[in-house]
A protein has these predicted regions:
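Structural WD40 beta-propeller signal
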Residues: 48-50, 97-99, 160-162
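Loop/turn-rich, solvent-exposed surfaces of beta-rich toroidal or solenoidal domains
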Residues: 91-127
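Inter-blade linker and blade-boundary elements of WD-repeat/beta-propeller domains
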Residues: 10-50, 56, 66-95, 123-151, ...
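A conserved positional marker within WD40/Gbeta-like beta-propeller blades
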Residues: 8, 64-66, 115-117, 151, ...
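Structural hallmark of WD40 beta-propellers
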Residues: 1, 52-59, 101-108, 118, ...
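A short, acidic, flexible beta-alpha connecting loop/helix-capping segment that sits on the rim
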Residues: 163, 172-174, 181-183, 192-196
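Conserved strand-to-loop turn within each blade of WD40 beta-propeller repeats
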Residues: 3-6, 14, 60-64, 109-113, ...
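C-terminal transmembrane module of eukaryotic multi-pass membrane proteins
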Residues: 149-164, 169-175
Length: 203
């Protein structure tokens, strides 16, 4: 899946897994307008990879300076649900953490305002109802970490395969690695610059 310049998410599927040169468009839906002419960047998205959750994705909505959770309703139509707010500029990147047995989800965002943010999504047992009688499970959204260590625009965030370490990169030319302590506080565990050798990752 990707977000086109016109704000449409387009989802493709390889109908024949033995021939990955051919992909078929299976769905398309709008998420909003792109950034204004005086802003750089565009939309971004990341899938929820959990095998035990319904199909979901988080989309960075450039012009709105937020990220939104999208998932399918009973008619298999994609709907905007929760909003990840609090950004002071265009959301350049989003990354949904792999869920390795956790009872909650983690989503990281990289923002033009120079901040890396981590959001925690926990199930709301009350659920919620949308127009048409569709009842869906909702998430309580909480920003549990907000870092400005890059002191510059942040462009990329990415989780490791277990969703326990987050990497971020920005215009300061550094990659920062973040990990939660035993108390649940997220801390920078390593900083790697372009001038550092491979041994920098072993610190």
């Amino acid at each position: 899946a990707f977000v086109a310049a016109d704000g449409q998410v387009k989802i493709y599927e390889a109908m024949d897994v033995t021939s990955l040169a051919h992909w078929t468009l299976i769905d398309s839906f709008p998420v909003g307008e792109g950034p204004s002419k005086d802003e750089e960047g565009n939309h971004c998205l990341s899938w929820c990879t959990s095998k035990f959750a319904a199909q979901m994705m988080v989309v960075g909505c450039a012009k709105d300076h937020v990220a939104k959770i999208f998932r399918q309703d009973l008619n298999n139509k994609w709907q905007a649900c929760e909003v990840l707010a609090g950004h002071g500029g265009v959301v350049h990147d989003v990354s949904w953490a792999p869920n390795m047995g956790r009872s909650y989800h983690l989503i990281a965002t990289a923002c033009k305002d120079g901040h890396v943010r981590i959001f925690k999504l926990t199930d709301d047992s009350q659920g919620g109802a949308l127009a048409g009688g569709w009842t869906r499970k909702m998430f309580n959204v909480e920003c549990i970490a907000d870092f400005a260590d890059h002191n510059a625009e942040v462009w990329r965030v990415e989780w490791n395969i277990t969703g326990t370490i987050l990497s971020s990169s920005g215009d300061d030319g550094k990659v920062r690695l973040w990990k939660a302590t035993y108390t649940g506080d997220w801390k920078c565990m390593s900083v790697v610059s372009a001038e550092d050798g491979p041994s920098a990752f072993l610190r």
